[in-house]
C-alpha cells in the first residue's frame, strides 16, 4: 500500500518520497514532507505543495489531498482500502508475503547440552523463532542453526556427574568433586545409563580430576540434546535447519590457525598463543591456546565463525545472552583477521528474565536444582502465553512478570485481549454461518471515520512486519496486534454490526481484522483462539 501511494508522487517529485503517519488521525492516513522537494525545484514550499495537491487531487486512490504545515497529507479512498482488504481476504496466510531478499544465517539458543532449557534460554529461543518466522514470511531466506557446545570441559563434567550418580544409585562409595551437575535429571540420566551400559561399567573407582570417558560423555550429551529438543518443541519453536557440532569443527583448528598466523593475527607470550583482538576494538588481546596446548573457548568460536562465513550468506545473526556482551569485540576481531567482513555479523542480546507467581519468586525446579525450567512454566501457563509475554518487550531489556497474570481472563492480559478480539469476530461469523472470505465481494463504501480508521490500521500489517524484522524487534508486531484488538473492541462496542444498515460493510472490516490477527499471531508462533 505504501509503495503504491509513494509511487503516485514519483512522477512529480522525481523519486519515491518517505511516507509517515500523521500524529493526528484527522490529518489523513499518510504525510509527505515537502520542504526538500520545493527547494530542489526552487519553488516556494506553499506554492509547491498547492500545485502538488492539484496534480494528485484526481487520483482515484485518494479521497483527499491537502497541504498542511510543510506536508502534503493524504486520505485514502474507500475503493483503495477495499482493494487491499480484498488482498487480505483472498491471500489469507500468504498476505504480505515476499520473496527474493537476503540469505541470512540465524544462530540462537545454542545452550550447552548439559541439562534441560531454563527460562533464560526460553526468551532467546522465542525471540529467535519470531525473527525467523517474520523474516521468512516477508521474503528473507532465513536458515536457523543451533551450535552444540560438545567439545568443552562441560561435557566431561556431564559424563562425570552421570558416572558418580550411577555409583550412588548402585550403593557404591562416591566422592563428589566441588564442581558437578546436580538435580533430578542427572539421577534420571544415571538410572538410564545403568540400563544402557550395565552395572559393571560403573563399579570402578575413578579419579574425578582426570575422568574423561568419551563414550559416556557423548551418550549423555545426546540424551541432553534430545531433552533440549523436547523443550524446543514444547515452546513451539520451529525445528532448526542445522545442528552444528563444536567437536566436529575442531578438526579444522589447524587450518583456521594457519589462516590467522598468515594474516598476522597471533603471537606467543607467557607460553600461550594470543589473538591481537585489541587491534579491532577489543579492550585487550585474548588467549586462544593455553600453556598446555589446548585451544580456549574463543578458539572454538573462531572456528565456528570461519565455518559460518565460508557458507557465504548475505548476513549472519547471533542471539546471545546479555552476559556475553563483552565477547562481541573479540569475535568480530577474529572474523576480520580471517579475511571476512565483520559488519555482516549482527549480535543481538537477550536479557535476563525474572519470574514471579502470586507476587513471590517462582520456585526453582527440583529436577534441575537451581534453575526454573522451561518445561515447568509451559505446563503452568502454556506455550502461547509464555511466548507472548517474551515478545512484549525488546529482548535486550530486563523482563519481569507474574505467571498468574498470564492466566487472567480479562483485558489486563494482552494475550487474552487480542485472542478475544479474534474469537469474538469468529463467533459473529459462525452465527451468520459465514466464512471470513465470503465478504470479499462486498464493496467498502461510504465509510465512516471509525470504519476507515479500523480498516486502515489492519492494512498497516505489511509495514509493521518489515519494521519488526529490519529492526529485529518482534515486539513491534505484538504491540501492533494489541492496538488493533483495542481499536476493534472500541469499534464493536460503539457500532452495531448485525442488523445495522451497514452490516455487510462492517462484516467485511471485521473479517479483515480477524484475518490480520490470526496471521500476526501465527508469525509470533501463537495460535489464534477460535472460541473463548
From Swiss-Prot:
GO BP terms, alphabetized: arginyl-tRNA aminoacylation
MF annotations from Gene Ontology: arginine-tRNA ligase activity; ATP binding
Catalytic reactions on record: tRNA(Arg) + L-arginine + ATP = L-arginyl-tRNA(Arg) + AMP + diphosphate
Record keywords: Aminoacyl-tRNA synthetase, ATP-binding, Cytoplasm, Ligase, Nucleotide-binding, Protein biosynthesis
Any one annotated GO CC term: cytoplasm
Motif 'HIGH' region mapped to chain: 111-121
HAMAP family per the UniProt record, alphabetical: Arg_tRNA_synth
Family statement: Belongs to the class-I aminoacyl-tRNA synthetase family.
Matching PANTHER family: ARGININE--TRNA LIGASE, CYTOPLASMIC (PTHR11956:SF5), ARGINYL-TRNA SYNTHETASE (PTHR11956)
Name of protein: Arginine--tRNA ligase
Organism from which the protein derives: Nautilia profundicola (strain ATCC BAA-1463 / DSM 18972 / AmH)
Gene: argS
Amino acid at each position: 500500500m505504501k509503495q503504491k501511494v509513494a509511487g503516485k508522487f514519483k512522477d512529480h517529485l522525481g523519486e519515491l518520497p518517505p511516507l509517515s503517519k500523521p500524529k493526528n488521525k484527522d490529518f489523513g492516513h499518510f504525510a509527505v514532507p515537502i520542504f526538500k522537494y520545493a527547494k530542489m525545484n526552487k519553488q516556494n514550499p506553499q506554492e509547491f505543495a498547492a500545485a502538488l495537491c492539484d496534480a494528485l487531487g484526481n487520483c482515484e486512490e485518494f479521497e483527499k489531498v491537502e497541504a498542511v504545515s510543510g506536508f502534503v497529507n493524504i486520505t485514502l479512498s474507500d475503493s483503495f482500502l477495499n482493494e487491499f482488504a480484498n488482498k487480505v481476504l483472498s491471500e489469507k496466510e500468504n498476505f504480505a508475503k515476499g520473496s527474493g531478499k537476503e540469505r541470512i544465517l540465524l544462530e540462537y539458543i545454542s545452550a550447552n547440552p548439559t541439562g534441560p532449557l531454563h527460562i533464560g534460554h526460553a526468551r532467546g529461543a522465542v525471540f529467535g523463532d519470531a525473527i525467523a518466522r517474520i523474516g521468512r514470511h516477508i521474503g528473507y531466506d532465513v536458515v536457523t542453526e543451533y551450535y552444540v557446545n560438545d567439545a568443552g570441559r562441560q561435557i566431561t563434567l556431564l559424563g562425570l556427574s552421570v558416572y558418580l550418580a550411577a555409583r550412588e544409585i548402585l550403593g557404591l562409595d562416591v566422592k563428589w568433586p566441588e564442581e558437578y551437575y546436580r538435580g533430578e535429571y542427572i539421577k534420571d540420566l544415571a538410572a538410564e545409563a545403568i540400563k544402557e551400559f550395565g552395572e559393571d561399567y560403573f563399579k570402578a573407582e575413578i579419579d574425578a580430576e582426570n575422568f574423561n570417558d568419551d563414550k559416556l560423555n557423548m551418550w549423555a550429551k545426546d540424551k541432553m540434546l534430545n531433552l533440549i529438543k523436547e523443550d524446543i518443541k514444547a515452546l513451539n519453536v520451529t525445528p532448526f535447519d542445522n545442528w552444528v557440532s563444536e567437536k566436529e569443527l575442531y578438526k579444522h583448528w589447524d587450518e583456521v590457525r594457519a589462516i590467522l598466523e598468515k594474516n598476522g593475527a597471533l603471537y606467543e607470550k607467557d607460553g600461550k598463543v594470543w589473538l591481537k583482538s585489541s587491534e579491532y576494538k577489543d579492550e585487550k588481546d585474548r588467549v586462544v591456546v593455553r600453556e598446555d596446548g589446548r585451544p580456549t573457548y574463543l578458539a572454538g568460536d573462531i572456528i565456528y565463525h570461519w565455518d559460518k562465513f565460508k557458507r557465504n550468506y548475505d548476513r549472519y545473526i547471533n542471539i546471545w545472552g546479555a552476559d556475553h556482551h563483552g565477547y562481541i569485540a573479540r569475535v568480530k576481531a577474529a572474523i576480520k583477521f580471517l579475511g571476512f567482513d565483520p559488519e555482516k555479523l549482527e549480535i543481538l542480546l537477550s536479557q535476563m528474565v525474572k519470574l514471579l507467581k502470586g507476587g513471590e519468586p517462582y520456585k526453582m525446579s527440583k529436577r534441575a536444582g537451581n534453575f526454573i525450567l522451561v518445561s515447568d512454566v509451559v505446563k503452568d501457563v502454556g506455550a502461547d502465553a509464555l511466548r507472548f509475554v517474551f515478545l512484549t518487550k525488546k529482548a535486550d531489556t530486563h523482563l519481569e512478570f507474574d505467571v498468574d497474570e498470564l492466566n487472567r481472563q480479562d483485558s489486563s492480559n494482552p494475550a487474552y485481549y487480542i485472542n478475544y478480539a479474534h474469537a469474538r469476530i469468529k463467533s459473529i461469523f459462525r452465527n451468520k454461518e459465514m466464512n471470513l472470505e465470503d465478504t470479499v465481494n462486498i464493496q467498502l463504501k461510504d465509510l465512516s471515520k471509525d470504519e476507515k480508521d479500523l480498516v486502515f490500521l489492519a492494512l498497516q500489517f505489511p509495514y509493521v512486519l518489515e519494521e519488526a524484522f529490519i529492526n529485529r524487534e518482534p515486539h513491534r508486531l505484538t504491540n501492533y496486534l494489541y492496538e488493533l484488538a483495542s481499536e476493534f473492541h472500541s469499534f464493536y462496542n460503539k457500532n452495531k454490526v448485525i442488523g445495522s444498515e451497514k452490516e455487510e460493510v462492517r462484516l467485511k472490516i471485521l473479517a479483515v481484522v480477524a484475518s490480520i490477527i490470526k496471521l500476526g499471531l501465527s508469525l509470533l508462533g501463537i495460535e489464534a483462539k477460535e472460541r473463548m
